[in-house]
């Protein structure tokens, strides 16, 4: 359990319920979230920002933009619930903002799965200072 939490801290971002986000990414991609996406490209990970390097990195960019649109909850602190039914993520919140937060995380997990073919190991530990400024969300 502790290992999964540590992995989650290094995930696509520090925002959101990291435990749930990590589980979603693992369920959708089959990849270790911290190792595969914790510092991927210009947008995945804690310090992520910049012009996306590829479609995988673009998933992380869109995820950060999704978080910026949330109002009424704190993606850095608030937790949500979801279930995994028939290999599908189902967000199960009554609170509209927490449901949107869950949907943001669901979208990035699905996007990463759909773009597994663009995953490039050379971007796994990409140095963020070399990233160019991205367009605003």
UniProtKB/Swiss-Prot annotation:
Tissue-specific expression: Expressed by the venom gland.
Signal peptide coordinates: 1-16
Subcellular location: Secreted
UniProt protein name: Basic phospholipase A2 homolog bothropstoxin-I
Consequence recorded when altering residue 87 to A: No change in myotoxicity when injected into mice. No change in myoblast membrane permeabilizing activities. No change in bactericidal activity. No change in calcium-independent damaging activity against EYPC:DPPG liposomes
Effect of residue 128 to A: Important decrease in myotoxicity when injected into mice. Important decrease in myoblast membrane permeabilizing activities. Important decrease in bactericidal activity
Outcome following mutation: residue 123 to W: No change or important decrease in myotoxicity when injected into mice. No change in myoblast membrane permeabilizing activities. Decrease in bactericidal activity
Main localization (coarse): secreted
Disulfide bridge map: 42-131, 44-60, 59-111, 65-137, 66-104, 73-97, 91-102
Task performed by this protein: Snake venom phospholipase A2 homolog that lacks enzymatic activity. Shows local myotoxic activity. Induces inflammation, since it induces edema and leukocytes infiltration. In addition, it induces NLRP3 NLRP3, ASC (PYCARD), caspase-1 (CASP1), and IL-1beta (IL1B) gene expression in the gastrocnemius muscle, showing that it is able to activate NLRP3 inflammasome. It also damages artificial and myoblast membranes by a calcium-independent mechanism, has bactericidal activity, and induces neuromuscular blockade.
BP terms from Gene Ontology: arachidonate secretion; defense response to bacterium; lipid catabolic process; negative regulation of T cell proliferation; phospholipid metabolic process
